[in-house]
């Protein structure tokens, strides 16, 4: 993400009306890759809704040396958390749910490590990293790629994860509760998280 922002800032230093050549883009991208020690990147420049340049630079992996092209897909990792939170905010703006609604109102099967937390857990709590679970708690249910745990499996297994702090008292980065948030989006909108994000964001 920080590389995308830096590249966007570099490209924005040119006047809006100025024509930037492909060679100038190449130099900017190559300098950015060197500065951040990035092996590969795909770049697209879009103007007035049309792609004017789409190009890959470098390699996907320093081990395989397979080249990046304009169609190379990169994992976006935790950038999806922003999409999830934005999707929840859209549904809240549409009065379909509220930040302070209880998760069990939408997902009755949702259970945390104790009854109080389960019943008090709100939509807001799903995205604030203050559940009481430790950093990366339960992540082995989703990593490495290829894990066969489904969303419902993850929701069902949350109750077995032990807290490291009291509910809402400490920040610990979390991944699994965003999967729960995605299921709330599914339940409220009638669309899978993927379809909702694709259509609305």
Predicted regions: what they are:
Residues 29, 49, 126, 201:
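Conserved hydrophobic/aromatic pocket- or pore-lining residues that grip, position, or stack substrates
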Residues 20-37:
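Short N-terminal segments immediately surrounding and downstream of signal-peptide cleavage
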Residues 34-67, 99, 150:
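A short, well-structured edge-of-sheet supersecondary motif
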Residues 1-22:
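Bacterial Sec-dependent N-terminal signal peptides
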Residues 20, 59-175, 182, 189-195, ...:
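Active-site-proximal loop and beta-strand segments within enzyme catalytic domains
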């Amino acid at each position: 993400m920080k590389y995308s922002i830096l590249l966007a800032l570099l490209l924005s230093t040119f006047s809006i009306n100025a024509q930037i050549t492909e060679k100038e883009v190449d130099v900017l991208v190559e300098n950015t890759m060197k500065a951040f020690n990035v092996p590969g990147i795909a770049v697209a420049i879009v103007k007035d809704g049309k792609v004017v340049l789409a190009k890959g630079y470098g390699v996907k992996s320093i081990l395989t040396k397979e080249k990046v092209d304009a169609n190379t897909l990169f994992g976006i990792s935790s950038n999806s958390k922003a999409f999830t939170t934005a999707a929840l905010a859209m549904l809240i703006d549409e009065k379909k749910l509220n930040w302070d609604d209880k998760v069990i109102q939408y997902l009755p099967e949702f259970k945390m490590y104790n009854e109080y937390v389960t019943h008090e857990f709100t939509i807001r709590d799903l995205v604030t990293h203050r559940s009481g679970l430790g950093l990366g708690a339960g992540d082995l249910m989703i990593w490495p790629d290829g894990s066969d745990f489904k969303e419902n499996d993850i929701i069902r297994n949350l109750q077995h994860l032990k807290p490291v702090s009291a509910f809402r008292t400490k920040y610990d980065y979390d991944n699994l509760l965003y999967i729960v948030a995605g299921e709330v989006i599914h339940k409220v909108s009638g669309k899978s998280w993927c379809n909702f994000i694709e259509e609305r964001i």
